[in-house]
Regions:
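A short, glycine/small-residue-rich beta-strand->loop->alpha-helix junction that serves as a flexible
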Residues: 6-17
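Conserved catalytic-core segment of nucleotide-activated headgroup transferases in glycan assembly
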Residues: 17, 110, 114-180
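Extended catalytic core of nucleotide-activated donor transferases of GT-like folds
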Residues: 33, 39-103
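Short alpha-helical segment that forms part of, or immediately flanks, the ligand-binding pocket
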Residues: 180, 203-207, 221-222
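Aromatic "clamp/platform" in nucleotide-sugar-dependent glycosyltransferases that forms part
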Residues: 194
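Short hydrophobic beta-strand element within catalytic cores of glycosyltransferases
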Residues: 211-214
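Conserved acidic donor-binding segment of nucleotide-sugar-dependent glycosyltransferases
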Residues: 226-237, 244-250
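A charged, aromatic-enriched C-terminal amphipathic alpha-helix characteristic of glycosyltransferases
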Residues: 236, 247-286
């Protein structure tokens, strides 16, 4: 049996990525359940996955079981358990180095930058991909001109006065069904966090038909292509650039279309097909 250990399911992209991955494994007839502290389930996105209490799962684990985890700080606790370990890598800082040095741990990655980082430690990994929830995909909703969306918990917007006169929608502490509707009706999306591991909110905004203005990211370089499907700028220049974009939206419609096209590479169908191929090739045999 596979048990995916996740922390308290607060609003963090890694939580949703874990649930999405587990859901696809179940579609592929792989036995997997989620284990969280006290068995708490997420309230900010929809999921039909069974969720168990970590406290109840841990005493019953055997060497035949597998524990999947993505939070590096869970490693010290989980390595003491009899189950085999699988690390679902969603970030590449020094906290994951002890995990990479443990050859008993199987490694899964979600994007190319993480895959490359893992290989620097002479470890093989399987890139299982990442996907945007279906409800974010644009389907012809009307866009409010001169409007943009932000996620204030991701960072502080410098020089906000440069965006006076434009309509701002703040996505904060809400269900993703509401967030997706905001993005579908917003003309632009202003990312605030520099050097994100991947930057899933920007990709969700691209799927929603937004013109994205973003600081540089790490893993996000595989989908954020400056000048082709988005704008990438220094943090201190983000407000001014967003205002320029919103003043001349029609001139940038090609970015909106290219962004939407790019986002379909991360549609759930694409990730599911990727996983199917990995199982057929034997790359994920340790999950069976």
């Amino acid at each position: 049996m596979n048990f995916y250990f996740l922390p308290e399911p607060t609003i963090h992209g890694g939580i949703k990525v874990g649930f999405q991955f587990a859901a696809m494994l179940r579609q592929l007839e792989i036995d997997v359940v989620i284990a969280t502290p006290n068995g708490s389930a997420p309230q900010w996105f929809s999921s039909q996955l069974p969720v168990l209490s970590q406290e109840k799962v841990i005493p019953n684990l055997t060497p035949k079981d597998r524990v999947i985890f993505s939070l590096p700080y869970d490693y010290d606790k989980l390595k003491k358990l009899p189950a085999r370990m699988i690390f679902h890598c969603q970030g590449t800082d020094s906290a994951i180095i002890p995990i990479l040095q443990d050859e008993k741990v199987e490694i899964l990655t979600c994007w190319t930058q993480a895959e490359d980082f893992v290989s620097e430690f002479l470890r093989d990994s399987e890139n299982v991909g990442i996907s945007v929830s279906r409800n974010f995909y644009y389907s012809g909703e009307s866009k409010l001109s001169r409007s943009y969306a932000t996620m204030p918990r991701r960072g502080v917007l410098p020089f906000p006065e440069k965006l006076n006169g434009f309509k701002e929608y703040q996505i904060d502490n809400m269900h993703e069904d509401v967030a997706s509707q905001i993005l579908k009706h917003s003309s632009g999306f202003l990312a605030l966090s520099e050097n994100e591991w991947f930057g899933l909110p920007s990709l969700e905004a691209m799927a929603s038909g937004c013109i994205v203005v973003s600081p540089k990211t790490l893993g996000g370089v595989e989908y954020l292509i400056a000048g082709e499907n988005c704008f990438v700028e220094k943090v201190e220049n983000l407000s001014e650039l967003m205002s320029e974009v919103l003043r001349s939206e029609q001139k940038h419609q090609h970015l909106r279309q290219r962004a939407l096209e790019m986002s379909y590479r991360y549609h759930p169908r694409a990730q599911f097909k990727k996983l199917q191929k990995l199982f057929i090739s034997g790359g994920l045999k340790f999950l069976r």
